[in-house]
Amino acid sequence: MAKKLSKRREALLKKVDATKEYSVDEAMATLKELKSAKFDETVEVALNLNVDPRHADQMVRGSVVLPHGTGKTVRVAVFAKDAKADEAKAAGADLVGAADLIEDIQAGKIDFDIVISTPDMMGVLGKVARVLGPKGLMPNPKTGTVTMDVAKAVENAKGGQVNFRVDKKGNIHAGIGKISFDADKIKENFVTLLEKINRAKPASAKGRYITNAAVSLTMSPSITLDTSEVMEIK
């Protein structure tokens, strides 16, 4: 099996010029040639930003709703009470609650991909911040997941919202769809994400903002992008 996989990998590597910086259009076309898995692979974006997230004013994070969605089925948990809980349920939230959800999380039951909360419930959520935080699940106003408009937040989450956050090394990783999508739709999702990230450039960030950019499939080698073109997407 290992030999078969290595041959497949070798064949894929021959389709990508590792010395080249691809235009966005070239990269989208090449991605289609790299499909090799039996499942519908995710199209992934990897960026390296010239920021130092140890400084609060250089933390790059946010969210964006991709025009063509992510192709993933997303399970949404909402912390809300009374009328807001009813709104969340009506909007299609998978889990809605308060103290009961806290107990489930403390017991290790994390059966959701995104957490949304009304502002008044954030104190309750503090009890599980150490569990949700490292998993990137803690609600945050910057990603639109702390809000009174829970119905809209649920719709966004279900409709293709991507949350991004730079890690301590300046990297951002995000999925922007499935390889079964038309190339034009993958590109539109990519452009929508990059517009948001480029507009989120901290005023204190100096020099070249995006130092490296690449796209890939779940099982494929990476395609390096022309960062000059990528930074012009605004």
UniProtKB/Swiss-Prot annotation:
Gene Ontology, cellular component aspect: cytosolic large ribosomal subunit
Pfam families: Ribosomal_L1
Keyword Secreted recorded: no
Any single biological process term in GO: translation
PROSITE patterns per UniProt: RIBOSOMAL_L1
Highest rank taxon of the organism: Bacteria
This protein's UniProt keywords: Repressor, Ribonucleoprotein, Ribosomal protein, RNA-binding, rRNA-binding, Translation regulation, tRNA-binding
Molecular function per GO: rRNA binding; structural constituent of ribosome; tRNA binding
HAMAP family reported for this sequence: Ribosomal_uL1_B
PANTHER family, A to Z: 54S RIBOSOMAL PROTEIN L1, MITOCHONDRIAL, LARGE RIBOSOMAL SUBUNIT PROTEIN UL1M
Function in brief: Binds directly to 23S rRNA. The L1 stalk is quite mobile in the ribosome, and is involved in E site tRNA release.
Subunit architecture: Part of the 50S ribosomal subunit.
Family, as annotated: Belongs to the universal ribosomal protein uL1 family.
Protein name: Large ribosomal subunit protein uL1
Annotated organism of origin: Sulfurovum sp. (strain NBC37-1)
Gene it is expressed from: rplA
